[in-house]
Amino acid sequence: MVEYMLFICSDPTAPEYVAAEDNIVEWVSEMEARGVARHGDRLRPIEDATTVTVRAGELLVSDGPFAETKEWIAGYDIISCANLDEAVEVASKHPMARFGKIEIRPVWPLGL
């Protein structure tokens, strides 16, 4: 099994979000029953972000995300799947696939 991180992203070009159609509880239940869901959660809005940078030994802390963008990461899920095809199938069932974008990345273990 391969662990994948799903970045749940907003998409200003997608249909407007409809809370009544957000069946995240059903999706989580289905993925837990299948044994693929590991962990996930929402993220606070970008206004609550803090960016930390260290350059030449100097700490720089700034409010907001690291990039100016209309898209933002709204949440994440970590899943465990047999392969990328299964991860794509799992992501395609996520409610936010209809209202945003889901980026899938394989986790690259540090091996510690």
Stretch-by-stretch model annotation:
Residues M1-L112:
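Conserved, structured core segments of small domains
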